[in-house]
Design a protein with these regions (language model features):
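Short, low-complexity disordered leader/linker segments with a strong preference
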Residues: 1-97
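Hinge/lid segment of periplasmic solute-binding proteins
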Residues: 58-92, 159-219, 403-409
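Short, polar/charged alpha-helical segment
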Residues: 82-89, 106-126, 221, 225
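Extracytoplasmic "Venus flytrap"/periplasmic binding protein-like
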Residues: 114-194, 207, 229-231, 235, ...
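Extracytoplasmic/periplasmic substrate-recognition and gating elements
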Residues: 202, 226, 350-353, 392-471
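Glycine-centered hinge/linker elements that transmit conformational signals in sensory
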Residues: 252-261, 296-359, 409
Length: 472
């Protein structure tokens, strides 16, 4: 359709007098009809123009539903309706350039490369989703909080920080956002009870501080095909006196690590190892311990999702405030279980892991088992699952099925029933109080978009970090 500006319309109806005289004779247009034509055009043209824009937006929505969001718990009609809501809610922020940041995981790569583009096309908001290291995300949040300057409009931050966010008073609780400045841009189909991990992002005041975006567990990983080989099972029983299988405690894990690294040594012409880990001096070495390694050994009190009063970090907590880490101050960070956990970490890394593991960090080590020379790993993040099922890699069968399996984490000698065992991590949307309201609302729309039911199942299949119960 040809769009005619108001200036062009004026020129078309107010011609030089000589032209008017020549035109009025053959057409005999009365003055009243001329006025009617002008008024009619002033109403019809904007309507037709708006219809054109609406049709264009509908086409964009349909394109994404048909080409990308092909797996969803919603029907196609429900998906279109939800995306139409996003397009309408975003109108006040159309044209804004919004910046959000997260750590680099397969799930967030999909968000950054695909979902940000979809959101931008559907809403008219230019969304930049940056990827960086988790330690850098923490530094950025800390800088915005302490320096009182806005760096980003939204963050995806580990739920481990719930205590810091609650105590700082600098984070805008999601509960307050959806009942306050963000009420008009909160998806009526958000369905909070459907989310996994809300307990992790809820403060002592029972307010939700962060909206879960993805979650993954830390579990035991092993080569099921090797564990089932008759020759290896026979040799293991001859050496250790019991069947080769999934270990339930650290002693059995150490036996299996020794078996593959020291006694088997080589399989199918390749050097193999009974253990994998990482040890480079890096921020990620911190969460190698904070992600419940100490409590797996038994350095915490009974309680879920955290031990109380001593949590899985070995820190004594009272009213959501840390009051002591050392034994002398009521903590467990230097207690027998923690010392044992540190000793096993160093010993196994040196004796049973590939030599290069000592110089690796979290990101570098995560995908190493996919190379096919690792028998087991006691501390493995399911966030790397997507890297472990790619066709053609050594740990995947020709039919696409995995040669590996996951199982619950083995427990250390100090562990008692009722203690936390293993680890679950939630990466969640976090918004600062000192951010601009309009920019924050636009970022809040994007946060809801990437966890919406229209999108979430496809995102789960891409990154394998499910966040909605309905998707599972």
């Amino acid at each position: 359709m040809l769009k005619i500006s108001s200036a062009h319309r004026v020129r078309s109806f107010f011609l030089p007098s000589e032209n008017v005289q020549s035109m009025t004779k053959p057409f005999k247009v009365s003055q009243s009809k001329m006025v009617q034509s002008i008024l009619l055009s002033s109403f019809i043209l904007p309507i037709l123009s708006y219809s054109h824009v609406g049709n264009a937006a509908d086409a964009v929505i349909k394109k994404w539903v048909d080409s990308e969001f092909t797996e969803s718990t919603l029907s196609k009609e429900q998906q279109i309706k939800e995306l139409e809501w996003f397009a309408k809610a975003a109108k006040p922020y159309k044209g804004l350039e919004i910046h959000v940041v997260s750590e680099t995981l397969a799930t967030h790569e999909y968000e950054s490369n695909v979902l940000a583009k979809a959101f931008s096309e559907i809403t008219g908001i230019r969304l930049i989703h940056e990827l960086t290291g988790e330690d850098d995300v923490v530094k950025k949040i800390q800088t915005q909080s302490e320096k009182d300057i806005q760096l980003y409009d939204g963050y995806i931050n580990d739920s481990d920080f719930i205590g810091a966010h609650f105590r700082s008073g600098k984070v805008l609780a999601i509960t307050d956002l959806i009942s306050g400045t963000g009420k008009s841009v909160t998806n009526p189909n958000l369905d909070l009870p459907d989310f996994i991990g809300l307990k992790f992002t809820t403060g002592p005041d029972n307010k939700l501080y962060q909206l879960p975006d993805q979650q993954f567990a830390n579990l035991y990983w092993y080569r099921a095909d090797w564990f089932e080989r008759a020759d290896l099972k026979k040799k293991f029983k001859e050496l250790y006196g019991y069947e080769l299988g999934v270990p339930v405690n650290w002693s059995a894990y150490e036996d299996i690590a020794e078996f593959f690294s020291v006694h088997v040594k080589e399989l199918d012409g390749h050097k193999v190892y009974g253990h994998m880990d990482y040890g480079r001096m890096d921020p990620s070495i911190g969460w190698r311990f904070s992600d419940a390694w100490l409590s797996m050994a038994g350095a915490s009190d009974v309680g879920l999702p955290n031990g109380l009063p001593v949590d899985e970090w070995g820190i004594r907590v009272e009213n959501c405030h840390p009051v002591g880490a050392s034994v002398s101050r009521g903590g467990e960070a230097n207690g027998p279980a923690s010392v044992y956990a540190l000793d096993r970490f160093v010993t196994w890394l040196k004796k049973f892991a590939p030599p290069e593991a000592y110089k690796m960090d979290f990101s570098e080590a995560g995908g190493v088992p996919s190379q096919g020379h690792i028998a087991q790993q006691i501390f493995w993040y399911t966030a790397f699952t997507a890297d472990m099922i790619k066709p053609g890699i050594p740990v995947v069968n020709a039919d696409g099925s995995p040669k590996w399996r996951m199982a619950p984490s083995p427990k250390g000698p100090y562990w008692r029933a009722g203690m936390k065992l293993g680890y679950q991590d939630v990466g969640a949307w976090t918004f600062m109080k000192n951010s601009n309201k309009d920019r924050r609302n636009a970022a809040w729309l994007y946060a809801q978009f990437v966890v919406s039911k229209t999108v979430s199942l496809k995102k789960t299949l891409k990154g394998l970090t499910p966040i909605r119960k309905s998707d599972i």
